[in-house]
């Protein structure tokens, strides 16, 4: 029997993460590429959702003794937890009235089908929830465990897609 946690960081066309077994303290890396035509937040959301669908398809739920905590980008975690993706499935439209991208809609339909079958085995949380700061009054070992994999996932992504400078160059070419 096992207790699993999944940490998924997404940037551009790539999701990198770790699938961890809390009891055995073992983890395996996870990498998923997905090409999207969408830009910005919508593109990131589609790439992350593609990774989640791919992961859920291959997940063996028979050996679990607790639901799998999946930490992913907040744009996906929020839509799942608020169940707002169901509005998209029914109407085919976003809140602003524009059509949902066809590829993303296909992924949401597949996700919904997987959740209908195995939804009780998965809990979705924002990856930022794994990054506790300070010393909150929670289980410190669990906080360190989550923080380790949060940091690991983002550092793996940033090796491929480096972050911008720590302090942005604010020189806008203004000559006085």
Question: Where do the protein language model's features map onto the residues?
Answer:
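Acidic, metal-ion-coordinating active-site neighborhood of RNase H-like domains
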Residues: 9-11, 133-137, 141, 149
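RNase H-like nuclease fold core
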Residues: 1-47, 57-59, 161, 171-176
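Short, low-complexity, polar/charged sequence segments that are solvent-exposed and flexible
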Residues: 24-26, 88-91, 143-145
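RNase H catalytic domain
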Residues: 53-139
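Hydrophobic alpha-helical segments
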Residues: 44-48, 52, 138, 150
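Glycine-rich loops and low-complexity Gly/Arg-rich segments
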Residues: 30, 93-98, 151-152
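Conserved phosphate-coordination/catalytic loops
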Residues: 41-46, 50, 101-105
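Charged phosphate-binding loop/patch that engages nucleotide di/tri-phosphates or the phosphate backbone
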Residues: 127, 139-176
């Amino acid at each position: 029997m096992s207790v699993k946690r999944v940490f998924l960081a997404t940037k551009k066309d790539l999701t990198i993460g770790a699938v961890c077994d809390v009891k055995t303290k073992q983890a395996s890396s996870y990498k998923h590429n997905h090409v999207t035509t969408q830009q910005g937040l919508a593109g990131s959301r589609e790439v992350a959702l593609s990774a989640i669908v791919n992961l859920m398809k291959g997940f063996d739920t028979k050996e679990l003794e607790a639901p799998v905590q999946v930490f992913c980008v907040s744009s996906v975690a929020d839509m799942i937890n608020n169940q707002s993706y169901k509005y998209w499935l029914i109407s085919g439209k976003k809140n602003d009235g524009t059509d949902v991208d066809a590829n993303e809609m296909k992924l949401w339909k597949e996700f919904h089908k997987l959740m209908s079958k195995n939804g009780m085995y998965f809990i979705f949380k924002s990856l930022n929830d794994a990054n506790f700061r300070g010393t909150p009054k929670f289980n410190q070992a669990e906080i360190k465990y989550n923080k380790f994999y949060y940091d690991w996932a983002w550092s793996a992504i940033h090796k491929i897609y480096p972050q911008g400078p720590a302090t942005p160059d604010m020189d806008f070419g203004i000559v006085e």
